[in-house]
């Protein structure tokens, strides 16, 4: 036996190495010293030929197959009867629940709702899915549902339930809750009662404990969701409820249709109240209507238009959605905040989140009328000369009928002049932003927002087509000034009132789902892409829902203002050992993260690059239903008026940029 073979045997437990396997000495000799050195630096490279290729991202066949399956609504006559979950799903179907957004958990309920044919979307985080449901409702006015499992899934939804509560969204919050039999035992993930957790964040809530009352409590839910001032309703389902079986309707209590458990009747203004309102408006020289949430939810934009045009009344839209009075209209005051101090009469219609006089720019001496569907809130925060309990549509229909024809040329001229001044300020801000961008080789927020504005409203795209949303601090405040709403449900104010960081992308994926389905006011633009402006701080919370957008082919263009910091970084200036808490790593590649989730990614630093990226991203979204994240590199110092004037400008309220009310 040769010396070489003997050494080989020693290394292989007495078995000679096959001739096809080179020795380490032979391998190194054959590849040469340089290759060996390279392998030590990058050991994977030398064996790359034997590494299988990384498979491409793809949508599982089961997704498209199951979405194409026939619907099934449970029936008492079926073998074994119908489950409590199917009873509840049938109630949701009868009530035209618009959509469900969820993560796995509460399995029997979400499965039954989806099987019944209600559009259902499964995502990556319960909190983000709650915001998606909220966004769907904000651009349609319809009731939507979200769902999560008990324990961690439910608690993950809390911030987003709070966001919906402040926006008065008709959101049906569903969650499983282990079993009644295991109450007080800390059984598995049942670590607390849900209803106390949502106290103060809902209009109504109930833990279901009687299986035969499941339909009755569905009625409670939809009665609250579809009458009065809307708000979240929270139901939690122990296992005894959704697993119960019924073979005939008589086994359920209070089992009858929606025409018997709630009414479509709405309060109308008392004749004397309507007459007084007409008289006050007719006597005023500069009246303005604040058209809030209720005008949108009650689909009252047509009588609003008739009343405004008939009597030359200025209109400013307010709330978590915009467009129920078009921004381009000569009577729109949404871009004329400098004119508000001239108003001598303010008519609040459907303004559910009332400001104080100090928060809004109206003349504190102006007279005030407020129209609300319930009486208990009238007079809160803003002293009234006339409070009217009425459905918003009924009141506006009354105005449209009873107001006389009247021209207010001076008032309309003042609105136009104020608008010109406002738009001039925007252009001045943009010109400063161009200089800052060119000096830093990054992109200022005003440049980003004007480019989006010009692309969506000044180019070849129908200006009414694209639903937009905005969030973040520096980019959100700027974006709100530049985005426009020319028809109902065209703009979603993501941070409205609660000012939460992070729901923006998820909320707009929900809005995108509504556009893809063509629900309500989105019907004429069914299939169009949506666009959202957000921040590097905000994208953290819902970026993984780009996977959800890809899975359901919801095309969204997401513009991320990457300024390497929380927007509140100036709060650390001058304080020792503080700034590090406000900063991120610089130049993070959110575009690369998006690519890893099945979306496109674009990274831009200049105005020309952004313009090209925006055009390409929108075209891909429209033609291929593929989403894109555009990572726009900026500087944190753009927030500072001292470093880069004008800095971050807080928008006047009410106006296109308002978010507090």
For each of these PLM feature ranges, what is it?
Residues 236-241, 473-475, 633-635:
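A glycine-rich phosphate-binding loop feature that marks nucleotide/adenosyl-phosphate handling sites
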Residues 1-11:
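N-terminal acidic, proline/glycine-rich, low-complexity intrinsically disordered segments
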Residues 182-190, 331, 340, 379-381, ...:
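Thiamine diphosphate
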Residues 4-5, 16-18, 32-40, 46-410, ...:
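N-terminal alpha/beta PP-like core and its mobile active-site loop of ThDP/TPP-dependent enzymes
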Residues 85, 106-107, 111-112, 421-522:
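Active-site diphosphate/adenylate-binding microenvironment
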Residues 293-294, 351-352, 473, 535-537, ...:
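Active-site metal-binding loops of divalent metal-dependent hydrolases
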Residues 54-81, 212, 249, 260, ...:
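Phosphate/pyrophosphate-binding active-site segments
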